Amino acid sequence: PYALKALPCVLIWFKIVWEQLTLDFSEPLHRPKTLPGKEEAIDLILPCYNPQEGWERLMIEKHAELVKMLKGRSLRFIVVNDASKRGFTKDAVERLLEALPDTMIVSYDTNKGKGAAVRAGLSHSTSSITLYTDYDFPYEADSICRMVEWLESGYDVVIAVRNHTYYTHLSTRRKIMSYASRILNFTLLGLTHTDAQGGLKGFNQRGKSFLASTQVNRFLFDTEFIYKASQESDVLIKDMPADLRDNVHLPNMRRGVLAEELKNLFLIAWRG
């Protein structure tokens, strides 16, 4: 009987949480556009760890596709080798640089994690608009171009929000972890932009400062980035629905990641 009496309260709580998870809290724009100069390239950071064979050919193809869609804007790749044990070969790098000589290669000998790799690439970015995504370009090129347009319109940070197509590519374990992370982002960190783990984000110079100040080296660096940016009331953050490319494979996370990232989540909340 007591459980039945409590049921309406539980349903109301779930309704409130769902509304918070799905609302767009972005503020209207009141700033001038922050267009990159004609001589300035948009920087795209691409962290790599043990990339699949042919990764450099995919980058060359995607660069050509993106430049065509970006309508005259130039684009520079910043490729970060996070101490790969295989795949990131000298021949592959030479082929990439021959086709795209403006590409910057950042490499080091100790594996540090995706967060550290993105920050390493960020330290070499000089553009007023910078993005990062995975080396295998899981998102459609159109999503990347739309992100650039939102940043040019004045947003400080733009987040790729994963739609239903993303979750069809996930294993049951990853689905549970993704949904759980959104709930924890809201309940523990108070984030209204709860989908912080999508692998595509963009930012201007102001947004760059928040990413540069993160400390998490692995999975939850995205969450720390959005948490830091959301602490400033005048920072403009945009949630942008994004589509995955066809035939994208999203691997399972290794064992122990959940416990490690729960610890990082509490550290983010503790450090504030």
Identify the role of each PLM range.
Residues T110, K114-H124, A141-F219, D246-G256, ...:
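Acceptor/aglycone-binding surface of glycosyltransferases and processive sugar-polymer synthases
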Residues E40-L46, K62, L75-V80:
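Hydrophobic targeting segments
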Residues K71-S84, V106-Y108:
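Short beta-strand/loop segment that forms part of the nucleotide-sugar
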Residues K90-H124:
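Conserved donor nucleotide-binding strand/loop of the catalytic core
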Residues N81-A92, F137:
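A conserved acidic beta->alpha catalytic loop
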Residues P28-P32, P51-K68:
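Short, well-formed alpha-helical segments that are part of the catalytic scaffolds
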Residues P1-I42, E53, G190, T214-G272:
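Hydrophobic helical membrane-anchoring modules
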Residues T130:
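Short aromatic/hydrophobic "clamp" motif used to bind/position activated sugar donors
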